[in-house]
């Protein structure tokens, strides 16, 4: 049993484990190849059918678990596949450099752009260094500095959202967490360049919103976006964290539900089984959508761009 796999993935993993064992057997005894290949093909078909069955009926809570999957690609993973010549920029020029947010200049199909996103970290050491993707004020100030730099040089901004929320520690509060987020919200409404935001995992509360005020808001199929985590909501409403699955359902945190509510623009499809199963395919889907969005926004004059962005967020809550 793979402890990094989710409960509903385990039946699929068992079949894939059998396939892997049979492949090793072929490697050791070529004479068995013909019979074993038939068995492998049968198991592969069974795996696809089972995966389709499971993933066609996921609950909101299961999607939330997928959004947090240990193997799910992060911002730097997508940057490597989508952008060329990425050059990371560091520091807020006030306090320090927050590793929970990464950003820098890259090229999208040879066009210079600014890329900013949350980065959670893969192993324990990196998770600690990046504070599990929970940014402190200096992270949001860094993001704002890069956004203003992008405006100065007329670079489109692409943001990738993947955070449980802004860091709630005492130090962060003392250094101005709330005002750092507020300044980002205010600034992003007035930047006179295209801003395209994509939720790739968790979109948690103000920590997500601080870099997701844009002209286009996209979500990967198995990502989530909410004012509070399902566990947090359950703890407040029912005083019981075990009610998190119910909270996830009631809150409407999934991409398709948020699309219905007109809170996001596009749901980007993921490969069968989720983004962690095929990062290349997922990256192609994201890049395709980013290019489509950019073509649309490039056609707008500055005044129209800003007016449309303002109206977009003023219409939140009116379905």
Curated annotation (Swiss-Prot):
**Group of enzyme by EC:** transferase
The UniProt catalytic activity note for this protein reads: N(6)-carboxybiotinyl-L-lysyl-[protein] + acetyl-CoA = N(6)-biotinyl-L-lysyl-[protein] + malonyl-CoA
SUPFAM superfamilies reported for this sequence? ClpP/crotonase (SSF52096)
Enumerate the UniProt keywords alphabetically: ATP-binding, Cytoplasm, Fatty acid biosynthesis, Fatty acid metabolism, Lipid biosynthesis, Lipid metabolism, Nucleotide-binding, Transferase
This enzyme's EC code(s): 2.1.3.15
Annotated pathway, please?
Answer: Lipid metabolism; malonyl-CoA biosynthesis; malonyl-CoA from acetyl-CoA: step 1/1
Task: Please classify the protein's predominant subcellular localization into one broad category.
Answer: cytoplasm
**Where is the protein situated, by its record's location annotation?**
Cytoplasm
Give the record's GO CC terms.
Answer: acetyl-CoA carboxylase complex
- Is Magnesium one of the keywords UniProt gives this record? no
Cited Pfam families: ACCA (PF03255)
For biological process, the GO terms are: fatty acid biosynthetic process; malonyl-CoA biosynthetic process
Q: NCBIfam families this protein is in? A: accA, AccA_sub, PRK05724.1
Assembly and partners? Acetyl-CoA carboxylase is a heterohexamer composed of biotin carboxyl carrier protein (AccB), biotin carboxylase (AccC) and two subunits each of ACCase subunit alpha (AccA) and ACCase subunit beta (AccD).
> What's this chain's function?
Component of the acetyl coenzyme A carboxylase (ACC) complex. First, biotin carboxylase catalyzes the carboxylation of biotin on its carrier protein (BCCP) and then the CO(2) group is transferred by the carboxyltransferase to acetyl-CoA to form malonyl-CoA.
Give the similarity note: Belongs to the AccA family.
Q: What is this protein called?
A: Acetyl-coenzyme A carboxylase carboxyl transferase subunit alpha
> Can you name the source organism?
Blochmanniella floridana
């Amino acid at each position: 049993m793979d402890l990094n796999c989710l409960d509903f993935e385990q039946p699929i993993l068992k079949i894939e484990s059998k396939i892997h064992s049979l492949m090793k057997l072929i490697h050791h005894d070529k004479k068995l190849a013909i019979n074993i290949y038939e068995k492998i093909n049968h198991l592969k078909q069974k795996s696809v059918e089972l995966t389709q069955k499971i993933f066609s009926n996921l609950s909101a809570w299961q999607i939330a678990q997928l959004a947090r999957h240990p193997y799910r690609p992060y911002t730097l993973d997508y940057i490597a596949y989508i952008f060329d010549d990425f050059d990371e920029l560091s520091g807020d020029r006030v306090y320090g450099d927050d590793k929970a947010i990464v950003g820098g200049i890259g090229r999208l199909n040879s066009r210079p752009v600014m890329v900013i996103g949350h980065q959670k970290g893969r192993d324990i050491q990196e998770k600690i260094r990046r504070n599990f993707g929970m940014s402190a004020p200096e992270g949001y100030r860094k993001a704002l500095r890069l956004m203003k730099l992008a405006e100065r040089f007329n670079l489109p901004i692409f943001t990738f959202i993947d955070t449980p929320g802004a860091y709630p520690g005492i130090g962060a509060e003392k250094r101005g967490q709330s005002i750092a987020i507020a300044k980002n919200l205010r600034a992003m409404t007035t930047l006179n360049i295209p801003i395209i935001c994509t939720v790739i995992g968790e979109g948690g509360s103000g920590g997500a919103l601080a870099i997701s005020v844009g002209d286009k808001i996209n979500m990967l199929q198995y990502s989530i976006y909410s004012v509070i985590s399902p566990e947090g909501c359950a703890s407040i409403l029912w005083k019981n964290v075990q009610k998190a699955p119910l909270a996830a359902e009631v809150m409407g945190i999934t991409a398709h539900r948020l699309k219905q509510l007109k809170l996001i623009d596009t749901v980007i499809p993921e490969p069968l089984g989720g983004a962690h199963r095929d990062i290349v395919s997922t990256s192609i889907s994201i890049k395709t959508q980013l290019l489509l969005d950019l073509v649309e926004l490039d056609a707008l004059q500055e005044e129209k761009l800003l007016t449309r962005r303002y109206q977009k967020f003023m219409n939140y809550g009116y379905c």
